[in-house]
């Protein structure tokens, strides 16, 4: 059962996220980045998320992509400490420039195991959308999709497979969400080894 969403607070976050990411696009595409944020937030709501989780879904990339610690402080001021904590938990770095890809991802997975359920929910919704986009883009553009990443395709697969194990072990409930993520990882394995 879905919890009631505070629409006024959500709309404020929607506008804030849109402004923050208005000049950003998905890697290798002309798709405005905001659509990813919206998809993640919608997925959170569809999986029973409450207002703070849904807002964190909209803002989950704001810190690492749009200003680091300064942006996190602004999120806390505008939307509260619960939202800021989830966003921080879903951020793989607050450091600009970003550390190397593998180091960030390895640390993210290690830290994710200790995170609260709200953060795990937003994270799996984010990574589900990312994995789905990778697979869809693979079928659209082929193997050149891997050039979009700071890692090779086997490292990308390692990351998603490791995330799946983390979600299965640490995210309570959400059986269908975890099964869907597992299916995406299986499909990713197939296209990587193709």
Label each region the model flagged:
Residues 1-194:
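Active-site helical microenvironments for divalent-metal-assisted chemistry
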């Amino acid at each position: 059962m879905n919890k009631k969403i505070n629409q006024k607070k959500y709309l404020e976050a929607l506008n804030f996220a849109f402004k923050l990411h208005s000049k950003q696009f998905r890697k290798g595409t002309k798709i405005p980045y905001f659509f990813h944020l919206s998809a993640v937030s919608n997925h959170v709501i569809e999986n029973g998320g409450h207002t703070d989780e849904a807002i964190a879904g909209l803002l989950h990339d704001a810190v690492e992509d749009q200003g680091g610690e300064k942006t996190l402080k602004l999120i806390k001021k505008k939307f509260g400490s619960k939202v800021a904590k989830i966003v921080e938990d879903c951020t793989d770095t607050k450091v600009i420039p970003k550390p190397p890809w593998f180091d960030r991802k390895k640390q993210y997975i290690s830290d994710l195991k200790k995170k609260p359920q709200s953060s795990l929910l937003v994270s799996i919704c984010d990574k589900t959308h990312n994995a789905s986009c990778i697979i869809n883009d693979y079928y659209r553009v082929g193997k050149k999709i891997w050039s979009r990443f700071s890692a090779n395709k086997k490292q990308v697969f390692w990351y998603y497979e490791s995330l799946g194990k983390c979600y299965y072990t640490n995210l309570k409930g959400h059986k269908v969400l975890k099964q869907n993520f597992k299916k995406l990882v299986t499909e990713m394995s197939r296209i990587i080894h193709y």
